[in-house]
From Swiss-Prot:
Organism: Oryza sativa subsp. japonica (Rice)
Pfam families given in the database record: NAM (PF02365)
Protein known as: NAC domain-containing protein 68
Induction summary: Induced by salt stress. Induced by dehydration, cold stress and methyl jasmonate.
Alphabetical GO biological process terms: regulation of DNA-templated transcription
Location(s) in or outside the cell: Nucleus
Keyword field: DNA-binding, Nucleus, Stress response, Transcription, Transcription regulation
GO CC entries: nucleus
Amino acid sequence: MEMAAAVGGSGRRDAEAELNLPPGFRFHPTDEELVVHYLCRKVARQPLPVPIIAEVDLYKLDPWDLPEKALFGRKEWYFFTPRDRKYPNGSRPNRAAGRGYWKATGADKPVAPKGSARTVGIKKALVFYSGKAPRGVKTDWIMHEYRLADADRAPGGKKGSQKLDEWVLCRLYNKKNNWEKVKLEQQDVASVAAAAPRNHHHQNGEVMDAAAADTMSDSFQTHDSDIDNASAGLRHGGCGGGGFGDVAPPRNGFVTVKEDNDWFTGLNFDELQPPYMMNLQHMQMQMVNPAAPGHDGGYLQSISSPQMKMWQTILPPF
């Protein structure tokens, strides 16, 4: 989830180009510089030293969606954002943001100009939690929030106004500082996968990719190990535990059935067919009508006839 932000978007590169910054420019202001030279000027509607901080309501977005909104930065990003009240007449800010919330950590730090004991700003550290409070999941996104110390935060003249601060200044960064690298690697993998040709196979009118087709073709192959396992299941009782005796597992991948039919090799079926067919017809007629004329002795006599006896002598013993 945290890696969902687009890194180095074209919009941000265009914004950096429009700033006309000198080569090698780095923006790493101190807490005092952020409050005195940027936040105080922003609230007083005075021009900034460099228009390098974007105006974004970061409480409407997840932190991993914010880097692409910034005007400058690779590992840390700066924003001016308004703050709303949690309750209509209260002084606490609403920390819900995107699909989670920001939670304060540590003590507030006063910010004062060098050589002065007068506090001009307050620095607060916050951690983003994904999900609903109080059971959100802690992430690696950190925010330093700077607000003016003497700002008038009384409820505004407009009835029902939720505005707590017109502007506060925020510095955002990821604690592990590796999310940008991971996102770039994911983009490379996705681009390679999109450019790779895909072979398709058809089965029952449905289109499948090559990987699915290979998996399907493997499912129709029976290996020696599969047959051995099936034979072992029979030896140990199989599904019901009743057992089927010992079964010798084949080793060549095929099930061989031994045929004990050598006894009829060389027999002349032309000699066997007439008496067999004659006695079969005789037996059928006798069973249908045992009292029919010409069938004295019935079924017992038919099976003791010379033709049937000859047939019985050539039948194999069971």
